[in-house]
């Protein structure tokens, strides 16, 4: 077995962190690799945070330790900071995380603008259709047509779906215009409804100089929210992903399926073995918070094929020499010896972990003759939009997989447990001005000729602001995508709660009977709310406690929905069997 001396030889910086000798650590870090990993897969910063050594963590953060690094189990530094239950640790890590993310976003803009500049000019429409297998839920699923113009280093993206409030989707006409020139960039958000433009032109290098750690101080309620909510880490497991051609026809005459999408023939693929893995940790919560979380658990999961594994704390392994962040009294000799088996022991607060795995299927329509390039033209724009849109972020993660040959003219991917997004590309280079797009639909036809595609030019008026619009300078507000995402989820949750309460108080129908439509709508709206809550890290305890009384009604509603779906699938199987029997009889008669 290795000794502490051996650990000092092989992992000297890690040993200083273990001892929380932060003064010596400060001296020794000069010229050293701050991202070195120990035998257990932890960087210096991960080790400091897991052990609750705030002083060492601050030293490492001053030396630019990567606050976004994941450990061997896929947890980030912020996840581990929340697990300690130390508000000061969470505050420090969160501040540096936000500073790092904002810095990286600004640093990535020049490269992104260069990619956009080098790509051929084009116009394309992306139709977003949100669908659900749950009956009645599909009634409130929205559609949107996203219109994109690209000319040189200029980009314009038009959307009409703005948000969700009071059980209805908020619509409006918005344009986001990006202009790049050398080290300058101009960002404009155009509100066509109010004729107001928020704009800012800035020097990227100066922005980096102005950006300071003090500007990224988190609010106290943000720290409190994280400490009173479960730590949730959702990831897409695609290591066993498989693209299979979808078949069409009857038994014995089945062929590879192909469909025409907006004038282009596309091969249809089913994407199998896509797993959404959700890890939930609750060891930092009080017993009351844990009970509240368990009471508000998602009743959809039993109906959606979710496989769940729970792992308890290491209470039976705790020794007299243990500390709060080393409950099983692991010694440095044991920890830094890669040949020593720690079994179920580990540093950090004993984990109370739940792992949920759900399989999803996605669909792809691939066209090898599509005039756009996914890598050169489309991905840079999706990268840009993913910085402020959770839906674009999910699409970006998916399209960066290794697809079959061609361009994905149509994609269907899961967004949440009961919601899918279907994205269709169309009307390529069919619109050179903003006025033309108003009357056009994504179901456009193929471009008339190859020359029309290759010589396409965007009218520069697309990127200009109408004279009648009011321009508001210096209105930019730096957003972090994960916080926008949580705010969006919370808004949906609150809207659904208000709607459910109003429908519950509405009483019986005018004819004295029960209002079935309102009751079912409330149940299915609640289903969406519960589904969305499990997909976000920002759960609101007060709102969650208000919803527990609906669980029984929702469970019954979802069981009825699942039964209806099962009966529908059974009818389809019976019809296909009858068709096959008729076909065989006709062959026999011949």
Swiss-Prot record:
Q: What is known of its domains?
A: The UIM repeats 3 and 4 are required for binding to ubiquitinated EGFR and 'Lys-63'-linked ubiquitin.
PTM text: Monoubiquitinated, inhibits interaction with ubiquitinated EGFR.
What InterPro entries does the database record attribute to this sequence?
ANKRD13 (IPR021832), ANKRD13_C (IPR055285), Ankyrin_rpt (IPR002110), Ankyrin_rpt-contain_sf (IPR036770), UIM_dom (IPR003903)
Query: What protein name applies here?
Result: Ankyrin repeat domain-containing protein 13A
Where, per the database record, does this protein carry Phosphoserine? 205, 586
Which keywords has UniProt assigned to this entry? ANK repeat, Cell membrane, Endosome, Membrane, Phosphoprotein, Repeat, Ubl conjugation
Q: Where is the UIM domain?
A: 483-502, 519-538, 549-568, 574-590
* Any one of the GO BP annotations: negative regulation of protein localization to endosome
Cross-referenced PANTHER family: ANKYRIN REPEAT DOMAIN-CONTAINING PROTEIN 13, ANKYRIN REPEAT DOMAIN-CONTAINING PROTEIN 13A
Q: What does this protein do?
A: Ubiquitin-binding protein that specifically recognizes and binds 'Lys-63'-linked ubiquitin. Does not bind 'Lys-48'-linked ubiquitin. Positively regulates the internalization of ligand-activated EGFR by binding to the Ub moiety of ubiquitinated EGFR at the cell membrane.
Domain of life where this protein originates: Eukaryota
Q: Does the keyword Cell membrane apply?
A: yes
Q: What do we know about how this protein assembles, alone or with others? A: Interacts (via the UIM 3 and 4 repeats) with EGFR (ubiquitinated); the interaction is direct, inhibited by ANKRD13A monoubiquitination and may regulate EGFR internalization.
The keyword Transcription appears for this protein: no
Gene of this entry: ANKRD13A
Q: Name one GO cellular component term.
A: perinuclear region of cytoplasm
ANK repeat coordinates: 40-69, 73-102
Q: Which GO terms describe its molecular function?
A: ubiquitin-modified protein reader activity
Q: In which compartments does the protein localize?
A: Cell membrane; Late endosome
